[in-house]
Each structure stands twice: as structure tokens, then as C-alpha cells.
């Protein structure tokens, strides 16, 4: 949103009433439509006069499969209705890697149905399928850091050997901005991921090493971690990993290491660099400068 505004674009956001991000959005030069993706009037108002639509909404915290399916199916139908009415020039959508109508995971399967609706709509579109993202406030890395700082525990779901490809959210934004302009991206489903293939345990080890905090590594079954996550989410608390993230850990989410470079012309930020400069305050890194492997000033967001 900030980068679109900085580029001189007029931005309108559809945001649920009571959303944690609403007050933050209100402090920026954007138009705000308050409502839900399942509210036809709100969706129509958000789409009215728009040239392009970027669909990022996903009911990740929702545990009830029927609700998830309804949001994916009916929410997409309303968005497409609004997009047709205003004759949008391009419709962008972001989904997790592995999304598809034949997926064994209910979330990815119903998200796949939504993707199919977009492909069949005839509206010029780009679908980005992303590996797990990290950034300030995320569950994958920020949640891990929060748990480690508070308890000294590194909690590893299962064996921790599922292969992942974490991508900094700022790099996903760069892909989106380029997909808005790139004619070669039109009517394609494009996989994107970070610059490294890492297991969950390797991610945890790298983060713990950067924090330099004495830690105890505990492996729990995914079932146990999932139960803890459901209880915490049911209490309105923010667990270090959400239930949906644990589902994705069952299958892994990776693509080619050069996927972003081939499609969008830049190399994503490595995990250690992204954590150092976009999640951890500098005081937590220590007085010796950036961690090994991080070169200060090698690449800024605007250079991507």
C-alpha cells in the first residue's frame, strides 16, 4: 500500500470493521471501505471505478472449513462481479504455493476453487503462488522470535524436516508491483519463493543464532502444536504458529530458487538479511555489526 501511494497511485482498501490494521490504514492517504468480503455492497463500493484489483484476503485464522470455503467461493464471486461491473484492467491474486482444486488440504483446495473462478472469468489476471512469507509481525519468524525471547524455547513441530522457502514480504510486494505492469505476466500462475531452501529446524537454528539467546529445542508432534494453536486462537491470543501454517508444514512449500529472478528480474533477500534488517531491532543484533553473511546496504527495497 505504501509503495503504491509513493508511486502516485490512488489506493482504496476493503477492510473489516475492527481489523487490527484499520487504525494504521487511517493514518495513510488511502480510501477505506469498511466491510467484509461476503458483503456485496461493500465489495461493490470497493471495486467501483477501480482500474486494478489486488486480492490478498484469506481466512487464515478461521478454523471452520465451511466458513473458509464460503469466503473463498462467494468472496471471489462478489469480487469478480464488482470487477466486471467496473471493467478492471487487471486482477491480481496471491495464494500459497500448492494451491489447487485437487489439493488434499481443505484450505488450499477451496483457495484453488477461487483461483479457477478467476481463470474462467475472462478478466486479465495474474496469480502469484507464494511460499511462506516472513516480515514484521508474521507467524513464521516473528512468532518464533517472540516465543524464544519470552520462554527460551524453540518449539519444532514434528521432525522439523519439512522443506520451506521463506520469502520476505517486501519482495512479494515487489513481485506484485511488477505484475501490475508486466504484460508477460498476464493470465499466468507464477510461483515465487525466497532464495534458500531450508527446513523449519534450519530456520529456527538460524534465528536463534542471530538472537544469541540460550535456548532449549523441543520437538512436539504437529497434532500437539495444532491443539495448542487452536486453543490460543480460540482465546483470541496469537500463537507462534497458526493452525493454517501448520497445515502448510505438512506438505512443504517450495519452488525453483530462481523463480523470482526469472519472472520479475531480481533476487529475493536471504532469510538472515531479511530478519536482521526488517524484523530484529539493531540493538538485538549486538554491537558487532550485522551477522555473518549480511552486507550492509547491498540492496534496498526501492532498488528491486
Specify the residue positions occupied by each region the protein language model found.
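N-terminal Rossmann NAD(P)H-binding glycine-rich loop of SDR-like oxidoreductase domains
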Residues: 1-9
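Conserved glycine-rich Rossmann-like NAD(P)H-binding loop of the short-chain dehydrogenase/reductase
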Residues: 9-17
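Conserved Rossmann-fold NAD(P)-dependent oxidoreductase catalytic core, especially the SDR/UDP-sugar
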Residues: 12, 59, 68-121, 125-131
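NAD(P)H-binding glycine-rich loop region in Rossmannoid oxidoreductase-like domains
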Residues: 19-20, 24-78, 82-84, 97-101
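Flexible, glycine-rich beta-alpha linker
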Residues: 103-105, 126-143, 162-163, 198
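Substrate-positioning beta->alpha
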Residues: 139-140, 159-181, 187-191
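A short C-terminal helix-loop "cap" of Rossmann-like NAD(P)-dependent dehydrogenase/epimerase domains
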Residues: 145-157
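Mid/C-terminal beta-alpha module of Rossmann-like enzyme folds, strongest
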Residues: 178-242, 255-304
Amino acid at each position: 500500500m505504501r509503495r503504491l501511494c509513493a508511486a502516485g497511485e490512488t489506493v482504496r482498501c476493503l477492510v473489516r470493521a475492527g481489523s487490527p490494521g484499520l487504525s494504521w490504514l487511517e493514518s495513510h492517504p488511502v480510501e477505506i471501505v469498511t466491510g467484509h468480503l461476503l458483503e456485496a455492497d461493500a465489495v461493490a463500493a470497493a471495486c467501483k471505478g477501480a482500474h486494478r484489483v489486488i486480492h490478498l484476503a484469506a481466512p487464515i485464522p478461521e478454523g471452520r472449513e465451511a466458513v473458509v470455503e464460503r469466503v473463498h467461493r462467494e468472496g471471489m464471486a462478489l469480487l469478480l462481479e464488482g470487477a466486471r461491473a467496473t471493467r478492471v484492467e487487471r486482477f491480481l491474486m496471491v495464494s500459497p504455493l500448492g494451491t489447487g482444486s485437487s489439493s488434499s488440504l481443505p484450505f488450499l483446495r477451496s483457495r484453488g476453487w477461487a483461483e479457477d473462478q478467476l481463470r474462467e472469468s475472462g478478466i486479465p489476471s495474474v496469480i502469484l503462488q507464494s511460499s511462506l512469507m516472513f516480515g514484521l509481525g508474521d507467524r513464521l519468524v516473528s512468532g518464533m522470535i517472540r516465543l524464544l525471547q519470552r520462554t527460551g524455547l524453540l518449539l519444532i513441530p514434528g521432525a522439523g524436516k519439512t522443506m520451506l522457502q521463506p520469502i520476505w514480504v517486501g519482495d512479494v510486494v515487489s513481485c506484485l508491483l511488477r505484475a501490475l505492469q508486466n504484460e508477460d505476466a498476464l493470465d499466468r500462475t507464477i510461483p515465487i519463493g525466497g532464495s534458500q531452501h531450508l527446513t523449519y529446524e534450519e530456520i529456527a537454528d538460524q534465528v536463534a543464532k542471530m538472537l544469541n539467546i540460550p535456548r532449549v529445542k523441543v520437538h512436539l508432534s504437529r497434532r500437539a502444536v495444532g491443539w495448542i494453536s487452536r486453543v490460543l486462537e480460540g482465546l483470541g491470543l496469537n500463537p507462534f504458529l497458526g493452525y493454517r501454517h501448520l497445515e502448510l508444514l505438512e506438505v512443504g512449500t517450495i519452488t525453483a530458487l530462481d523463480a523470482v529472478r526469472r519472472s520479475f528480474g531480481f533476487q529475493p533477500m536471504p532469510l538472515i538479511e531479511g530478519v536482521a534488517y526488517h524484523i530484529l531491532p539493531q540493538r538485538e543484533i549486538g554491537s558487532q555489526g550485522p551477522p555473518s553473511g549480511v552486507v550492509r546496504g547491498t540492496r534496498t527495497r526501492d532498488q528491486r
